[in-house]
Design a protein with these regions (language model features):
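Cell-envelope/extracellular polymer assembly enzymes that use nucleotide-activated donors
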Residues: 2-5, 23, 31, 158
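Short aromatic/hydrophobic "clamp" motif used to bind/position activated sugar donors
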Residues: 59
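Donor-binding/catalytic cores of nucleotide-activated saccharide
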Residues: 64-170, 181-195
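Catalytic core of nucleotide-sugar-dependent glycosyltransferases
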Residues: 176-184, 189-217, 236-249
Length: 287
């Protein structure tokens, strides 16, 4: 019986995919699904294709340039009888070029190491929007018809927001079973700057509206980041396009003005929090 399905979107160097696949333990209860995105449709499309092929009770997502640590096998053993909707596990990160520790998993580490279980659960549900380090129940996914948006960047945020909203029972394992590889030529960074800004704005806006629909009083302040960055650089045409994207998504002028007024405060809180945690402050679009 297939218990786990690991889905890997692939568009990049073959050696990275080979390393990722080789890090997945050989088990009779595990299915590895590689979706080759030769036409550049995006990781969201590839993950949706993988979901349609998944036979496991739980699905786990990996990026082809990342890999699993040996403890991943023990993690799978420990959750064989689990019935939670989503099971979170931890990660570390390295810089691809130097092999030195990187910042990409710092936000997850901070959540995992929190001594406040209420804060931890809220942040895992609504702040940790990456698809990796989650084992998500396939029956839960089917019940709520959860899928990835097929944008070129941030295609995972709407999926993760739905998982966070609808999951009735979650479990947390703090072992670092996954390694996130940070490198300079990622998909998010290689896309045309203005297209990236608009995708970024659109996907965070959709996520915010979904949270509001279910009465969750928080919003991704980074929704405004592309527009505010464009304003600061006097790229007013790009800023207006971002504004239009948020209006098309359904935001009223009054709500957007309210968010703009509070944005400097939220940005400062983010910088202070990251500085206190010893994290590198990364505010580029797409990170």
């Amino acid at each position: 019986m297939i218990r786990f399905s690991v889905i890997i979107p692939h568009k990049g160097p073959q050696w990275q995919l080979d390393r990722c696949v080789a890090s997945i333990p050989q088990r009779d209860d595990l299915q590895t699904i590689v979706i080759h995105d030769e036409e550049g449709r995006g990781a969201g499309w590839a993950r949706n294709q993988g979901l349609s092929q998944a036979e496991g009770s739980y699905v786990i997502f990996a990026d082809s340039d990342d890999y699993f640590h040996p403890c991943f096998n023990g993690f799978l053993d420990s959750i064989k009888e689990e019935t939670a909707d989503v099971i979170f596990f931890n990660a570390d990160s390295i810089a691809m070029e130097s092999g030195k520790p990187s910042w990409r998993a710092n936000h997850l580490n901070r959540i995992m190491h929190s001594s406040d279980p209420v804060w931890q659960e809220r942040h895992l549900r609504f702040h940790f929007t990456e698809p990796w380090c989650k084992a998500v129940s396939m029956s839960f996914i089917r019940e709520h018809a959860i899928r990835f948006n097929e944008s070129k960047i941030l295609n995972d945020i709407y999926f993760s927001t739905q998982v966070g909203i609808f999951a009735k029972r979650i479990k947390v394992y703090t072992d670092k079973c996954y390694c996130v590889c940070n490198h300079s030529d990622s998909t998010a960074k290689s896309k045309k700057a203005e297209d990236r800004m608009l995708d970024y704005t659109r996907e965070t806006a959709k996520s915010n509206l979904l949270l509001a629909k279910y009465g969750i009083k928080r919003y991704h302040s980074r929704m405004l980041r592309p527009m505010m960055t464009a304003v600061c650089h006097l790229h007013l045409g790009s800023a207006y396009k971002c504004w239009k994207e948020m209006r098309i998504c359904g935001y009223s002028i009054h709500t957007l003005l309210y968010y703009i007024i509070r944005y400097p405060r939220d940005l400062m809180k983010l910088i202070i929090r990251k500085a206190q945690a010893g994290e590198i402050v990364k505010l580029q679009i797409g990170n």
